[in-house]
Amino acid sequence: YFVVTDRFVNGDESNDQRAQGGAHPSFDIPIAGPDGRSDNIGYLGGDFQGIVDHLDYIKDMGFGAVWITPIIDNPDQAFTGGTPATWGSMWTDQGKTGYHGYWGVNFYRLDEHLPSAGLDFAGFTAALHAKDVKVVLDIVANHGSPAFTMPAAQPQYGQIFDAGGTLVADQQNLPADRLDPANNPLHRFYNNKTEMVQLSDLNENNPAV
């Protein structure tokens, strides 16, 4: 059963981070659509607790495993680069957030929107296993977060941090073809000849990556 964790159930409002993002808030960002409909490109509060609380619902449908979206740390702000996101638009990132988990900035750190007091990732998997439900983890090693076209560089976007929180890669708000990996160590994590919308494209040929 595939779960976009943030979109499933808000089991613990204390981890919603509703004030996060400062001038570029990241919680509950509605997009108006036709006939009174709307979409949302912000965080909405789904978390590990929400999944644990609804395991019987999942099992009653006949599922024996839950495939969840990435759990790694994503940027705290809404993205300011790219084309503004509108109802039904594709490849438009301005105003969007990393609620889906696919804009990783620290692959060693659990995103703060997911755990609760007494329920970290180990506790989450233990709770599912206790119900005889397996956990399938979505892992993205192809790219990081959106990395350029911002009016001014934003914290975390286009950056990668190591296990100790030290910055090891930074696209510095530059398009891929302007990166200089030969002379700038912070550019060496990224490909400099291909572009994936505004995403930082990880260089799979670099052993450090």
Map each language-model feature to its residues.
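Substrate-binding/active-site clefts of carbohydrate-active enzymes
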Residues: 6-209
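GGW-centered surface loops in extracellular recognition modules
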Residues: 1
